[in-house]
A protein has these predicted regions:
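Residues lining the SAM
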Residues: 124-128
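Class I SAM-dependent methyltransferase SAM/SAH-binding core
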Residues: 62-110
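Conserved class I S-adenosyl-L-methionine
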Residues: 5-48, 50-57, 62
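Short, glycine-/aromatic-enriched active-site segment of Class I SAM-dependent methyltransferases
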Residues: 156-174
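A structural alpha-helix within SAM-dependent methyltransferase catalytic domains
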Residues: 42, 65-68, 138-142
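A short glycine-rich, Lys/Arg-flanked "PGG" loop and its adjoining helix->strand segment in the class I
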Residues: 135-150
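A short acidic, Gly/Pro-enriched loop at the edge of an enzyme's catalytic core
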Residues: 113-122
């Protein structure tokens, strides 16, 4: 049984992070955006060269790799899953970006930048549970971002009603 950040349980029959690692094995981007939309988003950011970027719940660090390649930023990625952080490290190393992207295996809600209000971009895409909810995410990221910097928060949403059995399995069943 795994427990999500909301305290709900999922009877996975295995470690929760291993389960998510398996279900996301073939995903380059592990959030509610496709690779193409992620590339488009990075192109819209207009980050300063050498800027400071943070991505909380960075998954396989694809967003950070794209930002580092496009803008030569210095980036930090935070990921709680021991399986996903290893995939992120491989992605960063394979692309020759280890000198610009630092990856931390930790709870993103516990992260504190070296200086408050110092980041050019603070992002958390598809994982607002890290900071309890969407408002908590915006508040936490804003405190880390310099005046005039960018805060990027994304939420997954259902385009159609999910199967009740899925909601029951994930512990998100409102009943």
């Amino acid at each position: 049984i795994g427990t999500n950040r909301k305290g709900s349980t999922m009877d996975l029959g295995m470690d929760m992070w291993k389960y998510f690692g398996i279900t996301h094995t073939d995903h380059t981007v592990m959030n509610p955006l496709s690779l193409e939309k992620t590339q488009e988003l990075v192109g819209l950011l207009r980050l300063p060269e050498g800027g400071r970027v943070l991505d909380v719940a960075c998954g396989k660090a694809e967003f950070l790799c794209l930002a580092a390649e496009a803008y030569r930023v210095m980036a930090t990625g935070i990921e709680l899953s021991p399986y996903t952080i290893e995939a992120a490290r491989k992605n960063v190393e394979t692309r020759g970006l280890a000198d610009r992207i630092e990856l931390l295996h930790m709870d993103g809600g516990e992260y504190k930048p070296k200086a408050p209000e110092s980041l050019d971009l603070a992002s958390c895409i598809g994982a607002s549970w890290v900071f309890q909810n969407h408002r908590g995410t915006l508040a936490a990221l804003t405190k880390m971002t310099r005046p005039g910097g960018l805060v990027l928060a994304g939420e997954p949403f259902w385009m159609t009603d999910p199967d009740p059995e899925y909601l029951k399995f994930t512990g998100d069943d409102p009943n």
